[in-house]
Amino acid sequence: HVASVMDRLLSQAEERFGIRRQEIAPQTVFVSHETYTPARGGSAAAEIASLRQSFGEAANRVVIANTKGFTGHSMGVGIEDVVAVKALEHGIVPPIANYDDDFEPDPDLGDLNLSRGGQYPVQYALRLGAGFGSQIAMTLTRQIAGVGERIDRTVHNRWVADVAGYD
């Protein structure tokens, strides 16, 4: 179940990096995998339960983003990975599609923090990817402040030439 995967990931991150889930919740964007298919069960119920189980009361402080309302269901989850990384890079989280003043969210969402789009103080991105046959992958990515150029172009070009077999 998604909840056990999320809880295990966060527990490992807490142990390895000394973070605390309740403390990082206000700085976390959860990029949902929800397919907007509640009539077929969707994944919303599992994701809601996972956030609440893993973060407790702090779940309402995690900002939730989703791309499928804009892109449909792609054959891979790469779009969502890019959204997560770009949200960390720029501090801008895309809105939930059609989430405006007339939007009536599912009552099961309660007080969960659905993104209206814009600036959010995100430092962590929690990403769920799921596939047919109960394949589940989840990542927790942390923003690392840039300190100028990360790649030495001369070294990179030399490596590319070496790999490609050119002088």
What are the roles of these predicted feature ranges?
Residues 5-29, 54-61:
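Phosphate/pyrophosphate-binding loops at sites that engage ATP/ADP/AMP, CoA/4′-phosphopantetheine
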Residues 1-19, 36-46, 71-76:
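Active-site pocket-shaping loop/turn-to-helix segments
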Residues 28-33, 64-68, 127:
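Extended hydrophobic secondary-structure segments that form protein cores and membrane-embedded regions
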Residues 74-167:
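Conserved beta-strand-centric core segments of catalytic alpha/beta enzyme folds
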Residues 26-33, 100-105:
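A glycine-rich phosphate-binding loop feature that marks nucleotide/adenosyl-phosphate handling sites
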Residues 7-10, 48, 52, 82-85:
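Generic hydrophobic alpha-helical scaffold/packing signal
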Residues 44-55, 143-148:
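A glycine- and small-aliphatic-rich helix-loop capping segment at beta-alpha/alpha-beta transitions
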Residues 48-80:
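Conserved catalytic cysteine-centered active-site region
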